[in-house]
From Swiss-Prot:
Family that this chain belongs to: Belongs to the RbsD / FucU family. RbsD subfamily.
Provenance organism: Psychromonas ingrahamii (strain DSM 17664 / CCUG 51855 / 37)
Protein purpose: Catalyzes the interconversion of beta-pyran and beta-furan forms of D-ribose.
Stretches that traverse the bilayer: none
Gene (UniProt): rbsD
Active site as annotated: H20 (proton donor)
Protein name (database record): D-ribose pyranase
Pfam family, one: RbsD_FucU
Stored PANTHER family: D-RIBOSE PYRANASE
Catalytic activity annotation: beta-D-ribopyranose = beta-D-ribofuranose
InterPro entries tied to this protein: D-ribose_pyranase (IPR023064), RbsD-like_sf (IPR023750), RbsD_FucU (IPR007721)
Amino acid sequence: MKKTALLNAELSYLVASLGHFDEITICDAGLPIPNETQRIDLALTHGVPAFIDTVRVILSEMQITGVLLASEFKQVSPDLHRALIELVEQEKLAGSRIELIYISHEAFKERTSNSKAVVRTGECTPYANVIFQSGVVF
């Protein structure tokens, strides 16, 4: 059995297979997922698993170099947005250089088709979606 926080086999494989600048999306329960993109559906019920818990576990194993968010997230769901930014800031304090980019929600939905996978959570907070660009550890 794995010893680290990320126990889900599909997610663990996804993170291990990422190359530099590959993207993954972590989304709320309502974001449309392109048919051609791998879907890792974790949603059990409203709020389970939570978006921020899923992000926290993925960041425990994934090196990131970029973060893409819908600009609407900041205004509509400021508390969850702030919690996400705090996690990104912790990654920066650990020495990571991370670019934060805001785009429209429509552009965000289109951009998800570039992701290697979309991870669907049970989150029901509006605009609780993020695209992470993979970094390297060297």
